[in-house]
Amino acid sequence: MSNLPKPASHFEPEKNVDDKGNVTGSAPPVSKDTPTQQASVSLPNQEEPTQQTLVTTELPTKPDYNDLLLKASDERLLLVKEAKPQTLRFYASPTGLTASGFSIVTSPTSSYEQHAIDIFPYNCPVDKIVPAFTLEQIKITNDVLSSAQQSYLSRIPHDTSLVKLNEIEVVTGGSRDLFSLGTGYVMVVPNAEFFEGANLKFVYGVPMADIIFSKLTSQSAADYAFLDRSRIASGFIMFALHFALRTNVNLVVTKDNSARFASELSYSRPMSFVQGKKIVLPVQPHVCFAEGNSLMRYLDTALEGKYTQGVTYKYGRERIITETKEGGPITEITYLNIDNVTAQALGITAHVIGIDRYREDNVKRALLAYSLSGSTVDLMQSDESERMFGRMLSPQQELSYLLVGAALSQDVYKTILRANLDAFMMFGTVMPSLSDSLAKIPADAGNQQIISLIRERQSVSGFENAMEYLAMQVTPPLIWPCVISREVNVTGLSLLIMLLEYILFFIFYPSLAKKCGAGLCNNFYKLVFALSNSEWSQFVTRVGYDGTLGNSIPITDEDYWSNARRPALFTTDLSQFRLLGLIQRLIAPIGEHREHVKAQAAEFPRLKARTEYWNPYPNPGAQHVEQTIFKARLLQAFDETLTLVKDLNQTGQLVSKTLMAGVAKVFNTCKIKLRYHGVGFGRDIGMPLAYLRDRKINFYHDYDGRLDTPFPNQMMLVSASQSPHDHKIPIELRRKGQIVLETGVVWTLVLGLQFPSHQFDEDMTNDPICKFRAPSPGEELGKDDTIIAMCANACVPFSIAAGIISESYADGGMKEIKELLSGSLSSTEFRNLISCIQTAMQGSGFNVGRNRDVFRQNETVDLRFIEPKVRYVENELTIIAPTPQDPPIIRGDLQLIPEGLMPRFRLGLTAIADSSSEYSRLRKGLYLARCEVDVEAPNNALPLDLRDYVEVEYSHDLFQVRRIQTKQALGIFYQGEFYYRPALVPKMLIVVNTSEEMEPSYQEFFMQCLEERRIVIKLPKMYFLSRIVCTHSIQRPDERDAVLGLLAVRNDQIPLVTFYDTEQVDPTIQFDGLASGSKSKFIWPISSIDQNVVVRALGASGSTAPIGFAAPTDSMCDSGSIDDVGNLTTGAGVLKDPRVISLTNGVINYTERANLTGRVLYRYRPAYALDSY
């Protein structure tokens, strides 16, 4: 088993490769202990020819299992190290003109670049299967008998010309050691090697983990630190989780971990099981490989009887599922000595990989979506001798991760925004201006004040903020921004500057301006009040701030975002008002509707099926027309705002005429700086932004190019019950003050930009050269997949935790966990559970995505959800029922857990926690009764007829204290009689459902009644851990202290109970003197405690079975069958039950011909221009 799937991504970051598929460039460092990753695609070696004996003389060195996991994880992470830096590239227009200062200028005939990507980064090939359960031996003999066993192999009859002793040892040596003479028990127990590094402690075969569920830990449990219920419940969950993670592996059988035995030779059992078979090494022990033991013929006889009755045992490769055209095997059915729970989990993993096959078109369309229009991407043909196996996430899964990730952490929005900003800046098509245009204006008395004001407003937000705001327009609005409503404390020129500033903000950032509409419109209204008080008065009287006559109360962001109040500036025709009409006309959106064509073709995650978006910067096209409607609106804003303010200032009451003359000069300078903003915004800014809209992470937007339309209702994460009182977490955070925008940024866009494409030599041409760095599709795709992976790393633990507490999931061990916890989880406990799951996933080498990073979660949010869903919510309270017009993710369910993970989790939980499971060591129910026994065995039933006893349920009222003669006496009060002498108590079956707060005096009285054999105490709800000890009856300790301990157990404790086996006695132990033939036994299990025993009592040689001998069950020896999709059935054709132990099972394995990395080579020639969408 090894590290796990990484379901939050389709692709690994690209690598540069040569035409042979080898990685070139600055490859990531490779540890000397880690095999170098090869990118070549070559024909695998054909199946090796059959030989008579291919078993080597030495077993492979047993690797440390934790190292195996980490090695597999590290090999996967080698593929995602930081890509080597790339030289900045720019591309020329078809004219072929060059420009100094740029390193590369290409043409339409540029050569192809060759790259490689791995499209299945979460497959995990391993060369060894470590089962979750293994066999453990309990000996009953000392060295005297062991020496007889040690000489056994020397007396095995065999033909050395046919089979060598070391070959027998390879196949059967481990089994012969385990099932050897002098063995008391061979039992099935959890495998410490499998769970190495999992921070699980096994006590009597029951897993314990650090406490998740704190409420059950009390001071009374202090003396039983490893035995409180919460530790066991935690242990069960962490066991099942690690089981699910570590069985998500793919066994690859190669020459190094396999061998073959000749089919022509004549073998006897057990070697005949592997005759002519290709087997997987190392061979795990099994009782069927212990056959042929001349010292214990009774064991052979028992096994022979099973084979006669139709039990079939198999080991090695049985058949080939798929093969190459040349006949080389790709996938196979192989039988191993592993438990059926592990085998069933591996079957689930194989099924998931088998049904989700690589599709070439998907990969090509994804790469094209991350390429500029006009780029060429060609996938290079893979080797026909290989077959790809792996999983690719569906758009629904990726969308689920993004939405829930956003609900769990605000870092998701910030990370997506940063990725968009970095990708935008990568193009290199816009940069900060190195010149100061305002400094070039000749100073005079009229312009110094306005220059100072503009510099002051420009200083509040620089070039990086300006670019970030541009990137925000394509980033999903997961956190809504606002603009602060300012007090009316501006006068003079500031009124003009602020009026123009707010108008320009709507032109440059239309989608952000709409979301900030409350603050911006409040500020507009205040400016109108200061510039034209009469117009403001008429507006309030005849219209009102929000269309309500006479209403001049400022609109809050909360009211605006919930559509409770909307500014009249957006919703009402104000053309009858001169200033307000001008504002309304200038802030009206301009642009065009476009669609995410490439994203739709690539089937990227999108909230809506048809994804139109508003493009505020129309592309000027290949002719590079400067006079675009966007540039015209900018110039119009400067001209008409100045003209109107001049008209309002005819008497100079607002601004002196000298200052107004200076304003005209400064505005002319600003308009000159807008000279290239038509092509600059339409192509050099607009086209990179249009490219970003097709990326995976930009999965939705809500701006429709209109100011008068209301906002959609808020998306939230809710429980499946959708009760108004259930917890809700906003996916879109609409909360004032989360992001505050500075409108002064517009002066940076006006005065502080330069477009490298426009630095042409005007004597040569006026055609702007298109210079930019083209994106590298595989690299950019890998970056976005990493973000989705980080979302998944937060979502999967959350969704697993939600699944664990789901009320609909109440079987397969979950019932036992709920009984152990006896209550619902608090918010803190649920967070603890998520944290433990997250740690387990990272510690085991499992990462849902290619990245170990996890977004920091919002600590104040209550995360307890039952089957979380995404729904629209009105006013953060009312959940709106989905309609057919809603997006599919709103109408349907989230897909958060990687396919196969929860079925494997439930398999593991059923096996270890279900009270009816033979694998589980947690037992429930005890009898306390004194009976005399000569010898005892753990599975002995209570030898009493309980029909002779009157059943009474224990309560405090059962006891009374009365004065008897001169002293107070404690006794049982039953049917009007008081019994204070234990010997006189009537025969009673006392059912104790809880011993919580049972007085010590009551416990002592019960003990005396037990001594007198008057009562039987039944503890039906008591969970306990059991172990079996083989000992002589003389050595067995008295059980009275243990009985008192059981009566004192609190509800938050689980006791350890030892059961003794005195049937199997070491004959070398001698006792002097006489001993009674019987012993008092007090503790009896209600149900069997030895279901996990494979064999018992191998304490004698010969053909006669010793007392207490128990052979393995049929199911333990029944290999059954496995179909091509991983389903395990018994020999009778019934699906194998994970609660019934089976120790021989089939698995689907792969050969070296199976491509589990999904490495794909592709050729890429980037576009040379930014002229087309």
UniProtKB/Swiss-Prot annotation:
Pfam family, one: VP1-like_C
Family: Belongs to the turreted BTV-fold inner capsid family.
Its biological purpose: Inner capsid protein that self-assembles to form an icosahedral capsid with a T=2 symmetry, which consists of 120 copies of VP2, with channels at each of its five-fold vertices. This capsid constitutes the innermost concentric layer of the viral mature particle.
Predominant place of localization: virion
Protein name: Inner capsid protein VP3
Biased composition (Polar residues): 33-53
Gene Ontology CC annotation, any one: T=2 icosahedral viral capsid
Subunit structure: Homodecamer; each decamer is made up of two conformers of VP2, called VP2A and VP2B. 12 homodecamers assemble to form an icosahedral capsid.
